Amino acid sequence: MNAFDTDITEHADSSGCHPLFRDVPATVEFNKLRKRLLRLTRQAIEDFAMVKPGDRWMVCLSGGKDSYGLLALLLDLKWRGLLPVELLAVNLDQGQPNFPKHILPDFLTRYGIEHRIEYQDTYSIVTDKLPETSTYCSLCSRLRRGNLYRIAREEGCSAIVLGHHREDILETFFMNLFHGGRLAAMPPKLLNDEGDLMVFRPLAYAAEDDLEKFANAMQFPIIPCDLCGSQDGLQRNAMKAMLIDIEKRMPGRKDTMIRALTNVRPSHLLDRKLFDFAGLMANGEKGSDDALW
């Protein structure tokens, strides 16, 4: 039996739980939610072979609901003996005005979580280089990525772990489809260009709604993102609205879309680099009529 098929409760530590979970709601609803998120996180880690025992993971913590949820779920799995890696929580303070600098250090220290807070004023760089009418996402992302790679190397980490969830992956897929002219989403596992760091997204199967409910129940001290979240008209917002509308009219379509991303048939697409159409010819062997119907 695959270890990921067993009941979460079978792996609880003898001391009960990680300190982060000692005051959680004792309700059936929360227990189901927690177990579902743990199961989906474990499944993604297993499906995409993220774990190498003894590795050190740098868990990126922004102060938003998704990164809090990611950190909590990984700590929960580690506490239960299901994640044999070291965890380091890292926050990159990018210098946004009115950013509450005390919240994350206080939270991490309170629960005894190993962490590093790094200050780099990328906010000023972005706002100086771009006009107010521009969207900051691309430049901000490049600056953030460079700093995170540097910190991971300084801390001896083998992987950078991000809190992107199911909806992030689907939104990226449709952004690439509608605006980039390519079929691509966010990979759950990626090797950086230099070849020395992995990037993992263990929440690839987790629903954003579940992560929001989880964050509310856990009472995480959420920090809003004023730098990018306040800008209107972003392509991602349009994709998010489209997916919400589709799910409202046809419940369950998001799960179907995620399954589709795991079930690609290159022979039924038009990319000649992925499938040898030139070498496909009648030779008496059976083919497939699926694409005709």
Swiss-Prot record:
Q: Where is this motif: PP-loop motif?
A: 62-67
What's any GO biological process attached to this entry?
Answer: tRNA thio-modification
Q: What are the record's GO terms for cellular component? A: cytoplasm
**How are cofactors bound according to the entry's free-text note?**
Binds 1 [4Fe-4S] cluster per subunit. The cluster is chelated by three Cys residues, the fourth Fe has a free coordination site that may bind a sulfur atom transferred from the persulfide of IscS.
What is the similarity comment for this entry?
A: Belongs to the TtcA family.
The remark listed among the other comments is:
The thiolation reaction likely consists of two steps: a first activation step by ATP to form an adenylated intermediate of the target base of tRNA, and a second nucleophilic substitution step of the sulfur (S) atom supplied by the hydrosulfide attached to the Fe-S cluster.
Protein name listed in UniProt: tRNA-cytidine(32) 2-sulfurtransferase
